[in-house]
C-alpha cells in the first residue's frame, strides 16, 4: 500500500506525464490500424498457412507415397464422398463371399412315451432359448392340459393350431334315440324310482379288460362318491345314465386314464 502511495506522489510531481500518456495513445491507435499479418511481421513471428501438426502429417504421408501408389488400382474412390484433410482411403475388400454351410445343433427331443414295470412315462423336453417367464408359462400350459383330462377324454378331442396358440375341442355327442332299446316297465312306480341315477348307487357296473391277463373292473357309485351331494357337486345330475355317472366318478377320482388304457369303457 505504501508503494502505491509513493507512485501516486511521484506521478503528481512528474512534469511530462501528459506527454507520456499522449504518446501511449498514439502508439495504440497505430497498432489498431494494422492487420494481424503486419503485427506478426513486426513481432518477428512467421505466419503459417497451416499449423505445424499438419506439416508433420504431410511429411509422414510423403514417406509412404510409394506404397499408396501400389494400391491405387485396387479401389475406385467415390468422387461424391466428402474429403477429409489428412485422411487417406485404403483399398476396399475385393474378395467374394463364400457360401458356408451353417448347422444349428439342438438338444430338443420329441415327446416319448416310455413303459417299464412301474408303468408308463411321457417325457417332454423343454424348448431351448426360453426366458424364465416363458419357461414358467410353458410349464403352466402343460399342467393345464393334464388337469383338463379330469373332465374329458383327450383322445376324443380335436387339436387345432391357431395364430395365438392351440385350441382343443370336444364335440358333444348326443345319443341316437332311434338306436336305444326301450325298457318295458310293468309298474309305473319303478320308472319313477330309476329316474334319478343315484338310486343305482349300490349297483355295480363291470368293464371288460383289453388284455386276458387282467380281471374285469367292477365298480359302483358308492365306491366313487361318499354321497349324492358330492356326486352333484362335481357335475353329476340325476338324468345321467348309469355308465355316464360311473365315468364321471372315475374322472373325479383321477382313475379314468388308467382305466381307459386297461379296460373297454
Curated annotation (Swiss-Prot):
One of its GO terms (cellular component) is virion component. It is found in: Virion; Host cytoplasm. Residues 58-70 have a biased composition (Acidic residues). It holds the Pfam family Phosphoprotein. Phosphorylated in the N-terminus by host CK2. Phosphorylation of the phosphoprotein is required for the transcriptional function of the P-L complex. Residues 49-105 are annotated as: Interaction with the L polymerase. The modification Phosphothreonine is found at residue 62. Residues 42-74 are annotated as: Disordered. Residues 171-193 are annotated as: Hinge. Residues 107-177 are annotated as: Oligomerization. Its main location: virion. The record marks 138, 141 as: Involved in oligomerization. Nonenzymatic cofactor regulating the function and conformation of the RNA polymerase and part of the transcription and replication complex. Binds the viral ribonucleocapsid and positions the L polymerase on the template. Acts as a chaperone for newly synthesized free N protein, so-called N(0). Plays a role in virion assembly. This is Phosphoprotein. It comes from Vesicular stomatitis Indiana virus (strain Mudd-Summers) (VSIV). The gene is P.
Amino acid at each position: 500500500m505504501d508503494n502505491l502511495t509513493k507512485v501516486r506522489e511521484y506521478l503528481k510531481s512528474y512534469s511530462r506525464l501528459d506527454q507520456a500518456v499522449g504518446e501511449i495513445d498514439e502508439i495504440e491507435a497505430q497498432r489498431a490500424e494494422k492487420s494481424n499479418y503486419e503485427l506478426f511481421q513486426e513481432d518477428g513471428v512467421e505466419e503459417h498457412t497451416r499449423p505445424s501438426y499438419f506439416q508433420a502429417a504431410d511429411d509422414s504421408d510423403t514417406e509412404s507415397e510409394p506404397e499408396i501408389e501400389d494400391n491405387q488400382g485396387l479401389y475406385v474412390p467415390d468422387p461424391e464422398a466428402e474429403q477429409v484433410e489428412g485422411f487417406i482411403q485404403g483399398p476396399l475388400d475385393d474378395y467374394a463371399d463364400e457360401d458356408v454351410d451353417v448347422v444349428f445343433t439342438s438338444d430338443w427331443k420329441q415327446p416319448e412315451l416310455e413303459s417299464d414295470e412301474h408303468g408308463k412315462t411321457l417325457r417332454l423336453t423343454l424348448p431351448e432359448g426360453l426366458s424364465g417367464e416363458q419357461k414358467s408359462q410353458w410349464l403352466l400350459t402343460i399342467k393345464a392340459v393334464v388337469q383338463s383330462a379330469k373332465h374329458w377324454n383327450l383322445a376324443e378331442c380335436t387339436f387345432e393350431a391357431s395364430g395365438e396358440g392351440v385350441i382343443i375341442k370336444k364335440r358333444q355327442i348326443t345319443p341316437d334315440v332311434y338306436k336305444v332299446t326301450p325298457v318295458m316297465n310293468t309298474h309305473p312306480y319303478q320308472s319313477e324310482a330309476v329316474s334319478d341315477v343315484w338310486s343305482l348307487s349300490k349297483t355295480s357296473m363291470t368293464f371288460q379288460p383289453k388284455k386276458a391277463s387282467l380281471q374285469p373292473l367292477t365298480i359302483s357309485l358308492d365306491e366313487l362318491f361318499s354321497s349324492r351331494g358330492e356326486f352333484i357337486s362335481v357335475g353329476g345330475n340325476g338324468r345321467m345314465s348309469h355308465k355316464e355317472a360311473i365315468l364321471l366318478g372315475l374322472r373325479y377320482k383321477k382313475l379314468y386314464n388308467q382305466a381307459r388304457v386297461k379296460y373297454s369303457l
